[in-house]
């Protein structure tokens, strides 16, 4: 009984007097009303939904007219009381009509003036959730001043729920919490009652698609919590997305980013080498780097005189560190990249098959068939120290002739591809002799493929190689990939022709001139 009384008609003290004046007097004796009089005659029937029931209650000239006309309509149209008898539904629809009936209140409870007009709910009948949001049902809360709430510019003002949103679901109201983003945009929330955000009832059906939460001005001051573990993200980046809500410590004395020394960098033998660390001896990621940083790395500290050549650096910032030099490679692979036996394999080359540093890279670029000038019978005196300046090719730019190499004289360097007997053979390896996955490939790479290629090599005719190391096959079609990119992944084994760029341009010009002359003769 006390629970039902708790949700009964409870008015605020400031509106008690006004509510008492609004409560209608006991209905007078039944008299025929003149047709089309009162507020209802001006704005249509009492069931007109353009004006809520609050308008009829507080603006009607004759309160008894609005109450008598509206109570029957509300009782018949409300879906909240369809399971109750007609008499009970009419009583619950508008309890002010029962003002003259006596209401029992617990002893010691002060009965408000207007609250005495509310009839207690029958046994077994509970108030629904709609009664708490409808201003006019069961006297859930008073409606004075709610019209101003609809027209206020205050964003945090809670608007009352009107007839137009009666069919929409009701989600938890949590004043002071952030608005539920999904609810504001769609008017739905999959979390329902368990959602911890606020769900304003004034949001229209379908939500506000372009609604966005007001941006919060970031606060650079993070909380210091002595005794708590340090925030790892703050220690690394000096930022914390949780801000003042973070439960970890944010020490200010460690705000300055410390320069990581070589001894403090992580060693991860099972991971690939850190490329930047191997070239510069430093790593900007510090302890957060996931690659390996060996301590016994040796960086060249002085330039080395190699003939008349000038030491070239492997880094673009060579001007800032002139002491970092490298030894020019004696030979290059078919892609013009240096082959340096004993050096660490270039990780970028192993992954992508290319290297942005080209001939200046100081790492090894292995290939199944590397062209060694000594093995090919080329006079090594032609290969000067200026070989380091070459981006492509085997010899210096001064040698304008093509080196004619026969297949038996080509040095063969085997790459380390895994042999997995019982597994399927790697198709790409069997076709090209290369595998971009290297040791990580899960397929079989038979070693007898090398012997098969060596046996077939003497039967092949002489191959004329260009300065870039690609074969010249007169009469064959031009390699389409080479014509587009200037490179060829098949190298010397490609069956197409690889003409130099100058020859291609000259051939194109001559064909254009011939076509123009033909058109001129046809016109004449």
Swiss-Prot record:
The gene is HUA1. GO terms for molecular function: DNA binding; mRNA binding; RNA binding; zinc ion binding. Residues 19-39, 300-319, 505-524 are annotated as: Disordered. Involved in flower development. Functions in floral reproductive organ identity by binding AGAMOUS (AG) pre-mRNA and promoting its processing. Functions in association with HUA2 and HEN4. A zinc finger (C3H1-type) spans 174-202, 225-253, 268-296, 340-368, 420-448, 473-501. Pfam families: zf-CCCH (PF00642). Its main location: nucleus. Residues 512-524 have a biased composition (Low complexity). One of its GO terms (cellular component) is nucleus. It comes from Arabidopsis thaliana. It is found in: Nucleus speckle. GO terms for biological process: cell fate determination; flower development; mRNA processing. Interacts with HEN4. Interacts with FLK and PEP. Highly expressed in inflorescences, at intermediate levels in leaves and stems and at lower levels in roots. This is Zinc finger CCCH domain-containing protein 37. InterPro entries: Plant_ZF_CCCH, Znf_CCCH, Znf_CCCH_sf. Residues 24-35 have a biased composition (Pro residues). Keywords: Developmental protein, Differentiation, DNA-binding, Flowering, Metal-binding, mRNA processing, Nucleus, Repeat, RNA-binding, Zinc, Zinc-finger.
């Amino acid at each position: 009984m006390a629970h039902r009384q708790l949700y009964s008609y409870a008015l605020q003290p400031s509106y008690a007097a006004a509510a008492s004046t609004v409560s209608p007097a006991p209905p007078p004796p039944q008299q025929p009303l003149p047709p089309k009089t009162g507020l209802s005659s001006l704005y249509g029937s009492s069931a007109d939904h353009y004006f809520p029931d609050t308008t009829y209650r507080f603006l009607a000239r004759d309160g008894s007219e609005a109450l008598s006309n509206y109570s029957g309509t509300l009782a018949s149209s409300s879906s909240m009381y369809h399971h109750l008898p007609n008499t009970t539904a009419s009583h619950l629809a508008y309890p002010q009509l029962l003002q003259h009936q006596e209401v029992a209140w617990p002893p010691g409870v002060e009965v408000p003036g207007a609250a005495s007009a509310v009839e207690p709910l029958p046994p077994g009948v509970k108030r629904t959730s709609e009664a708490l949001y409808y201003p006019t049902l069961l006297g859930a809360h008073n409606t004075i001043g709610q019209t101003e709430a609809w027209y206020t510019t205050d964003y945090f003002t809670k608007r009352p729920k009107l007839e137009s949103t009666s069919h929409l679901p009701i989600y938890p109201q949590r004043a002071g919490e952030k608005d539920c983003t999904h609810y504001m945009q769609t008017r739905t929330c999959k979390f329902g009652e368990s959602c911890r955000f606020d769900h304003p009832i004034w949001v229209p059906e379908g939500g506000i698609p372009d609604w966005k939460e007001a941006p919060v001005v970031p606060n650079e001051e993070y909380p210091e919590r002595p005794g708590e573990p340090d925030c790892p993200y703050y220690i690394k980046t000096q930022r914390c997305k949780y801000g003042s809500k973070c439960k970890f410590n944010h020490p200010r004395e460690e705000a300055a980013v410390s320069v990581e020394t070589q001894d403090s960098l992580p060693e991860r033998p099972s991971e690939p080498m850190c490329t930047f660390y191997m070239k510069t001896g430093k790593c900007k990621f510090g302890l957060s780097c996931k690659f390996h940083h060996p301590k016994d790395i040796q960086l060249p500290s002085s330039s080395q005189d190699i003939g008349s050549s000038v030491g070239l650096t492997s880094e673009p910032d060579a001007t800032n560190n002139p002491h970092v030099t490298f030894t020019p490679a004696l030979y290059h692979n078919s892609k013009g990249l240096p082959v340096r036996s004993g050096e660490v394999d270039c990780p970028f080359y192993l992954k992508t098959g290319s290297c942005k540093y080209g001939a200046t890279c100081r790492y090894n670029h292995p290939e199944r068939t590397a062209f060694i000038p000594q093995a090919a019978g080329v006079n090594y005196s032609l290969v000067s120290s200026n070989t380091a300046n070459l981006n492509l090719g085997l010899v210096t730019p001064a040698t304008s002739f093509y080196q004619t190499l026969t297949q038996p004289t080509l040095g063969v360097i085997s790459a380390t591809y895994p042999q997995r007997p019982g597994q399927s053979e790697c198709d790409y390896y069997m076709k090209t002799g290369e595998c971009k996955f290297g040791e990580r490939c899960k397929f079989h790479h038979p070693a007898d493929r090398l012997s098969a290629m060596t046996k077939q090599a003497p039967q092949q005719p002489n191959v004329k190689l260009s300065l870039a190391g690609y074969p010249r096959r007169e009469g064959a079609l031009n390699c389409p990939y080479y014509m587009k990119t200037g490179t060829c992944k098949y190298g010397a084994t490609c069956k197409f022709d690889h003409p130099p760029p100058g020859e291609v341009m000259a051939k194109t010009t001559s064909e254009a001139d011939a076509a123009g002359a033909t058109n001129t003769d046809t016109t004449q």
